[in-house]
Curated annotation (Swiss-Prot):
Pfam families: Misat_Tub_SegII (PF10644), Tubulin_3 (PF14881)
Location in the cell: Mitochondrion
An example Gene Ontology CC term for this record: mitochondrion
Main subcellular location of this protein, as a coarse class: mitochondrion
Gene: DML1
An example Gene Ontology biological process: plasmid maintenance
Keyword rRNA-binding attached: no
Keywords: Mitochondrion
Top-level taxonomic group: Eukaryota
Summary of the function given for this chain in its UniProt record: Involved in the partitioning of the mitochondrial organelle and mitochondrial DNA (mtDNA) inheritance.
InterPro entries: DML1/Misato, DML1/Misato_tubulin, Misato_II_tubulin-like, Tubulin/FtsZ_GTPase_sf
Protein family per UniProt: Belongs to the misato family.
Protein's name according to its UniProt entry: Protein DML1
Length: 484
């Protein structure tokens, strides 16, 4: 058994993790003769030998702001003594209950689950918290809460310092210092240690995070220490990228324009991308469409996240792969190329493009080829189907590989507009557009980050990353100046 632990860092990341584990839960009720997946890879089994039953909890460590868990208490389903509503008849007689914030009522969906009743239909208004629709019971050690930062339902991705509406968790350096100063020792010695004890042979981690705000600095600091502690494991980083002046420029075909707020956003993005991509074996820059809520984003991205991870837990040993295999396959012999630049879900009726780099304005090239044609360094197709795929034998040429895995089984918590058919193909590509992004980032640092101590280190790191994705000849004057 080769377990995978998911570490989700931010409210938005927790929505994706929740949708993923809800999909894992639906597979537990698969009544077919041959199970398609091994639940123990992503879920931790607890065996009750008296009742001869098995219960499962996610192999997960969730980070969120205070009250970000909604109505869910850490010990709500294991020990009720820390969790009260207005009726406190069972509270300890030797102490007083201190209420530090208004009680968040349990969602109708959770009440229905507890009572064994039909669940109500989900929408944006009743899914403000990821816990509103979580179907599995998490271990208390899965929950990690920022002590001084509070969740704000009006701005859920940027916690509020002590709920004073005065300071936001919106800078890379704030998140980085927050982890290093307050959580480094406690996290590794307690909750992470407990999660590791539940694993027999851990193969790696999925790190899900935001990078436009303080969570990018927080997850970067966490991953650096995690990699130092467990250097032999494999790390996949899933980084949510919000819309910014680059994506606006791409969409509207206009010049890139920055103000103070968006320049800070890009600075956060660059620092988090540099750190996470260096420490990860694969870095997946997911685009977070501002038109969707966090619940909808989790629903939209789940086929991508679930699809790649389905390769890791299939019961068919001929089709199952591990995280190291996937990372080496997509790096294709060069461990400096760790970034997935394109990830498309392909069905008969449509194609969904999941990644941020596909929405980035393109620099000019000396080559006479069309600027949209990027050189492909490696490509992996993951075909999902519950039927035997005779025509899709695994391809083993240098740049294009194909992997077959079992079909997608979405949970009822997925938004109706994103409930996909079980059969589809994921196309993951590492190509030359990464150079385009990092050259633009380098131009940004040169123009807008003038006095930071790490300025030269950032420029060198960005230049080195860009050079890893070069192919052919470029103009000496090749830069993104014309976009500004």
């Amino acid at each position: 058994m080769h377990e995978v632990i998911t570490i989700s860092v931010s409210q938005r990341a927790n929505h994706l993790a929740t949708q993923f584990f809800n999909c894992r839960e639906t597979l537990l009720y698969d009544n077919t003769k041959d199970k398609v997946n091994d639940p123990k890879i992503f879920l931790n089994p607890t065996i009750d030998r008296i009742s001869k039953t098995v219960s499962y909890s996610p192999r997960a460590l969730l980070w969120d702001a205070k009250t970000g868990n909604g109505s869910l208490g850490s010990y709500q389903y294991s020990d009720g003594s820390d969790y009260y509503f207005k009726n406190d008849d069972d509270k300890p007689s030797d102490g007083d209950l201190m209420q530090t914030h208004p009680v968040i009522p349990k969602s109708d969906y959770q009440r229905a689950l507890d009572a064994g009743l039909p669940e109500p239909k989900l929408n944006n208004s009743n899914t403000k918290y990821w816990s509103d629709y979580a179907r599995l019971i998490y271990q208390p050690s899965s929950f990690n809460i920022l002590r001084d930062w509070y969740h704000d339902t009006d701005n859920p991705n940027r916690p509020d310092f002590k709920s004073l509406k005065d300071r936001r968790f919106d800078k890379f350096i704030i998140g980085e210092e927050e982890f290093k100063s307050n959580y480094l020792v406690d996290f590794f010695d307690t909750n992470l240690h407990h999660e590791l004890e539940q694993c027999d042979t851990l193969q790696g981690f999925n790190i899900i995070t935001d990078i436009d705000n303080g969570w990018g600095g927080f997850s970067s600091a966490l991953l650096v220490e995690l990699r130092n502690e467990l250097p032999k494991n494999t790390y996949f980083s899933w980084a949510f990228h919000e819309s910014d002046p680059y994506t606006v420029s791409y969409t509207r075909n206009t010049k890139v324009q920055f103000n103070k707020k968006t320049a800070e956003q890009i600075s956060n993005k660059i620092r988090a991308t540099t750190s996470l991509s260096q420490e990860s074996d694969l870095f997946i820059p997911v685009y977070s469409d501002p038109e969707y809520s966090n619940w909808e984003i989790g629903s939209l991205v789940c086929p991508l996240f679930d699809g790649l991870n389905s390769v890791l837990d299939g019961t068919d040993t001929e089709k199952r792969r591990n995280m190291q295999y996937l990372s080496e396959l997509l790096q294709n012999g060069d461990n400096n190329r760790k970034i997935i630049s394109s990830a498309n879900m392909i069905r008969k009726d449509r194609i969904i493009d999941y990644l941020y780099y596909s929405r980035f304005p393109t620099q000019s090239r000396k080559s006479s080829s069309a600027v949209s044609e990027f050189h492909v360094f490696s490509k992996c197709n993951i075909s999902r189907s519950n039927k035997e795929m005779k025509d899709n034998a695994e391809i083993k040429n240098v740049t294009n590989k194909q992997i077959n895995t079992y079909g997608y089984k979405f949970a009822d918590t997925v938004s109706d507009q994103f409930k996909e058919d079980s059969n589809y193909k994921l196309c993951l590509t590492s190509d030359e557009r990464c150079r385009n992004v990092f050259k633009e980032y380098g131009d940004f640092v040169s123009k807008y980050i003038k006095y930071d101590d790490d300025r030269e280190d950032m420029k060198n790191s960005l230049e080195n990353t860009a050079s890893a994705y070069e192919f052919g000849w470029y103009d000496d004057s090749d830069s993104g100046d014309d976009n500004y």
